[in-house]
From Swiss-Prot:
Name of the protein in question: Eukaryotic translation initiation factor 3 subunit A
Bias (Low complexity): 987-998
Biased composition (Basic and acidic residues): 589-624, 830-900, 921-984, 999-1050, 1058-1086, 1109-1130
Source organism phylogeny: Eukaryota, Metazoa, Ecdysozoa, Arthropoda, Hexapoda
Every PCI domain range: 319-502
InterPro entries assigned to the protein according to its UniProt record, in alphabetical order: EIF3A (IPR027512), eIF3a_PCI_TPR-like (IPR054711), PCI_dom (IPR000717)
BP GO annotations: formation of cytoplasmic translation initiation complex; regulation of translational initiation; translation reinitiation
Function: RNA-binding component of the eukaryotic translation initiation factor 3 (eIF-3) complex, which is involved in protein synthesis of a specialized repertoire of mRNAs and, together with other initiation factors, stimulates binding of mRNA and methionyl-tRNAi to the 40S ribosome. The eIF-3 complex specifically targets and initiates translation of a subset of mRNAs involved in cell proliferation.
Region described as Disordered: spans on this chain: 589-632, 830-1140
Any one of the GO CC terms: eukaryotic translation initiation factor 3 complex, eIF3e
Chief place where the protein resides: cytoplasm
Amino acid sequence: MARYTQRPENALKRANEFIEVGKPLRALDTLQEVFRNKRWNYAYSETVIEPLMFKYLYLCVELKKSHIAKEGLFQYRNMFQLVNVNSLENVIRGYLKMAEEHTEAAQAQSSAAVAVLELDDLDNIATPESILMSAVCGEDAQDRSDRTILLPWVKFLWESYCQCLELLRVNTHCEALYHDIARMAFQFCLKYNRKSEFRRLCDKLRKHLEDICKSSNQTTGVSINKVETQQLCLDTRLYLLDSAIQMELWQEAYKAIEDIHGLMALSKKTPVPKTMANYYQKLAMVFSKAGNQLFHAAALLKLFQLTRELKKNLTKDDLQRMAAHVLLATLSIPLPSAHPEFDRFIEADKSPLEKAQKLAVLLGLPQPPTRVSLIREVVRLNVPQLVSEDFRNLYNWLEIDFNPLNLCKRIQSIVDIIEGGPAESNLLTPYIQSLKDVTIMRLIRQISQVYESIEFKRLLELASFCNIFELEKLLVESVRHNDMQIRIDHQKNSIYFGTDLTESQREYRPDGPSLQSMPSEQIRSQLVNMSTVLTRAVSIVYPNRERDQRAKLRTQMVHHYHEIKDREHQRILQRQKIIEDRKEYIEKQNNAREEEEARRQEEESRKAKLAEQKRLEQEQEERERKRHQNEIQAIREKSLKEKVQQISQTAHGKKMLSKLDEEGIKKLDAEQIAKRENEELQREAKELQSKLKSQEKKVDYFERAKRLEEIPLFEKYLAEKQVKDKEFWEATEKTRIENAIAERKDAVSQQERLKRMYPDRDEYLDALKKERASLYVEKLKKFEIALEVERKKRLADRIVRRREERRQAFLREKEEERLRKEEEIRLAQAAEERAAAEARRLEREAEDEKRRAQYEKQRAKEEEAERKIKEDRERLAREVAVERERSEKERDTWRPRGGDRPSAPAGGAGEWRRAAPPAGERNDRGAERSERGGDRNERGGDRIERGGDRIERGGERAERGGDRDRKDDGGADSSWRVRREPDSQRAAGAKDAGGAPASRDDKWRRGGDRERDRDFRNDGPRRDRDDRDDRDRGGFRRNDGPRRNDEPQRETGGNWRDAPRQSDRDNRRPGGERRDRDGRDVRGDQRGPASKEAGGGGGGGNWRTAPAPRDEKPAAKRDQPQDKENKGGDDGEWTSVKRR
């Protein structure tokens, strides 16, 4: 039985009843069942579902069930995101508003609870509990109250924002609502100072943007190519950037700047100046916090250019203030190092150059800026002339004037002006320290050009900004980056500059005020100076040389110009034409691209409309199906009520039904109600067991409570024991220390007492050494003798060992020489084998190439033969048509006369062909043969068409055709269509054909059994392929025999590959007779005697009309002595054909 579900309006009414009796969880479950059941999803409009949804979300907020709210919101979105977007927007905004109100109420409640706690007892503000809590957790009362009361609601509100963002991220209809919720989430993070949630929110939005860029344009999807979408994303990222700066999350601010730059690059329209100004301002702030003074100054310079160019109502004071800001930021950039590539020796993810290039892209610069380029740009924009006199002097003192003795004093005056200026000057305060560092570096460089050495004291007097440690650090940094040659002498408290005259590791290009070069730089540039002086001397000695050379060069240039001016003029004109053509081509390409884009968009919109229409149709079908199911369900519910009424009439049924509510009754049937009675008995038994368990739990809880009460007593005992242990340890330690002091005093007194025995000890040792000196000398002599003996022994052993080593080395070299020779012999043999193999391969390739050429030649000849056959067939068809017309005329002329057919003359073919039979018989046979002739013409065409692929099917054709050629004894000029037949068969064929008697031409047709042709036709099974090909092309045929008619001889022999020739197959008399050849077809000797019904000339027995088994042996013929030998040759030819 299907599960019973309530209608939406009934569910809402029942949920209100549960709320009134204080059961919000039951009310939430009731409403949740409606959304879980897809039965009502599409059956009701938003006017019915929207109040239910508000009540559902209200309960979720009250009970802090964010996951249940998410389920309902997603279901509601699927129902109304394409039907009524306003309803979805109202529901989501109402849900977030309720969550925010409850969070604010919790915050007020937390503050009120702290205030009540603080004002609880004015006489005893610091209670013992508050003191202990502050010592344990380090939190005040407000933090503890917030963690208890406010933090759960903050977490719920955060989850609500995340759920709504996930809900709306792919819906183009709710795109504005999505970005509004994102801004609300930023405000939430700012209000409650949630930095970790802010980072996760930034990552979530960045992931959503990546998904939008990757995903295709679906029906309800968001397309990043839309201008509105790009603007909304840009505004949201700008708001994110402001929030990150307020929360001082500089890493997230930098990521937001990257996203903003990507969106501006993706947009086809230029952003408004206000947006760009805000972008540069925030970018400069981020660079400043990151400590990157160079890009900070570059961002301020871009902001200054943009404001100066686009802001019309800019006052002089604002312009002066901005110019001072830009100038001071640029001058505060640290002096660049001479070797910035030092950082590439440090392992990092990215090199400094790549990072600088990436930052330059954010500023829209083609390459990373430098301090020199920024100062040059500042001067080009006339910034020093826009600032006040003091800052203009600052620029001159740092970048133009050379006055190291007064430099720091002058800069100090500017620093005092900045520090003592008005409140708006506070923007310049962060640059003071950087300005001092730059001033000290300028001072050191200028001092190095004036003094060779200077005392620390004097240098500190000139550098009033820093102490000795800071100054020494700057000097070491200068040497580290190879900017200067400095040596510090701490013994003399002096500093030496540029003392190494042989060292100059870089080319010195001063980027500030300079008086002279360093000594090392002067040594490095001696050759350059000498070249300059020599050039000047040559110009003095030969004053006119340069003028003459210029005149000569000018003459050559004029002459060359007159030679090429016409050609250059034409080239320029041609270039203009090329440019115009290129412009036209580009314009055409653009137009075509735009048309293609328009077509593509139209196609996409059409597909979207079709998809939308299809979806609506499917939804309509789904609604109809669900409505039908609802009707069926209503019928089932009605029958269930009737059954329940029948059961309720009995006393037992009333007792059972009283324990069930309406919803439970609707879910059961009669059998299940009977089953519930047994379940009730089991339930009572379980209740008894549960009571016993509850008593057991009470005893357990009582025992646990006693032990909890004992814990403070145990802790008190342990604390007292710890105090006693500590006192005992201190007493023991004091006693140990006193004993150690006493022992040391005793040891010292013993040492002082024994010192008077030192002289006696020394006298005793001297006497002992004198007594044992002689013994030492004697032992030394024995050692030297033993040493000499051992040395000689070892020398002898070394001589023997070295001889053995030389012998082994000789044998080893001899063995290596033998192995080397064997290896050389092996390599030579291998090289010869490779050369022989290569030669064989080349020979095979040459042979294959030769065979391929022969095959192509044969193919060309066959194609030529087919063309001629086609021409002959067409010519013969025309002759047949003319002959038929003539026969018709003769028939019309001879038919009245009748009479017998005259006998055929004994002459040639021309004579007996004119001896025609009577008109009636001849015409009847002529008509029949004309029909058969047409069929043969058609079959002949089929043979020609099939003849084209005989080369490819050469295996099968060669086997059959080769046998036919070799079984013929027709001599060198006999075709496969001309075969010998038994005398009886020939006679029958001649009789049926009514032709001339056999003459000597018959032997020519049969191709007699000539011994002289046997060598050409049958030369054994080992015949070469080239000989066979030549034979097939007619190279071994003899054309000296008589022919049937006076037509010229064929160009090629009777090769089986040749297509059937019209002249061979269809040469017949005017009455339709075929030649005598048809009686002796290719397979005539295998088919037996020709049928008499085939017509005159034996033409009805075509080789295609009857089966001819290859294995059937022909009748014994005395004229066929070469059959066995030809078969052997044919097998060899079949193998050759397969190799091709």
